[in-house]
Amino acid sequence: MLDFVVVAMVFAVPMLIFGIGKAKAKQFATHKRIMLVLSAVLITAVCAFEIEMRLVGWQHLAESSPYWSVLEEILWVHIIISVSTTICLVATVVFALRKFSSPLRPGSHSSFHRKIGKATKAGLILTAVTGWIFYWMAFVAV
């Protein structure tokens, strides 16, 4: 599952940027579909990953890493960013679903949506980067 999440993030970041591009092109329905699918996939992958980490753990797989002494600190940085991003992502989706009308078009919620969307985008990219760094330090650089 860990490898799946690492690879999924390689595809998630470009899909995120592609989906944002659809909103900028005023293709709001396509933007909504892409973002809802991406959000569902990410949340499902993270939940499955967390279940596996609780059942199997990761420390025994990383004991031979030359970075063993700093892995916990690196992981905490990643966790803080990823939890904050998850909260932002859920807020972005929930507010968008509640506030935007059908058919989709810009409205009074658009300014807030752009701001929280930018924070979510930055968080998702940082989550991916810190996750990749941790993955490499813990499991690849042995």
Name each model feature, range by range:
Residues 1-142:
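Alpha-helical membrane insertion/targeting regions
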